[in-house]
């Protein structure tokens, strides 16, 4: 009988612990939002210097982009329109920002947030179609 009486307390404690974890993760994601917004807006802004924008790319994305030409030559050729950041979602070490009519995906690195994909358009249930992306 004591076991049954103790179980509700265990469940409540477990729920409180899980709730605390969710609150902790939500706090981390909201703290990251301004940085994600700043990086996404700068990368999508065609008036920002190409080298500064290239520095915002994740290493594998930079490598993929430079298969055809140097990043500083490639970025000005792409149809970036810039615009206001309309929304930001952060989860774990990843983020998504909607800038103007585009979607930007980012990853958190030791050096801060880096762009993994940009100039992305949704395709319903299929993965986004991105003009800039890593492997």
Regions inferred by a protein language model and the residue ranges of each:
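Sec-dependent bacterial lipoprotein signal peptides
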Residues: 1-26
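Short, intrinsically disordered, charge-biased short linear motifs at domain edges
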Residues: 13-15, 40-42, 55-61, 107-108, ...
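Bacterial signal peptide processing site
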Residues: 29-31
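Short solvent-exposed beta->alpha transition segments
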Residues: 34-41, 45-89
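Exposed beta-strand-loop-beta-strand "reactive/processing" segments of non-cytosolic proteins
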Residues: 80-106
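Short beta-strand edge/turn micro-motifs at domain boundaries
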Residues: 103-134
């Amino acid at each position: 009988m004591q076991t049954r009486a103790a179980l509700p307390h265990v469940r409540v404690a477990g729920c409180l612990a899980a709730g605390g974890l969710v609150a902790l993760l939500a706090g981390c994601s909201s703290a990251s939002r301004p940085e994600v917004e700043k990086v996404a807006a700068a990368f999508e802004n065609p008036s920002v210097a190409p080298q500064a924008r290239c520095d915002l790319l994740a290493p594998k994305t930079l490598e993929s982009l430079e298969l055809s030409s140097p990043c500083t030559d490639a970025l000005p050729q792409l149809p970036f329109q810039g615009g206001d950041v309309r929304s930001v979602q952060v989860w774990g070490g990843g983020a998504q920002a909607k800038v103007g009519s585009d979607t930007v995906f980012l990853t958190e690195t030791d050096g801060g947030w880096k762009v993994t994909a940009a100039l992305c358009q949704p395709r319903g249930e299929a993965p986004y179609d991105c003009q800039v992306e890593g492997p």
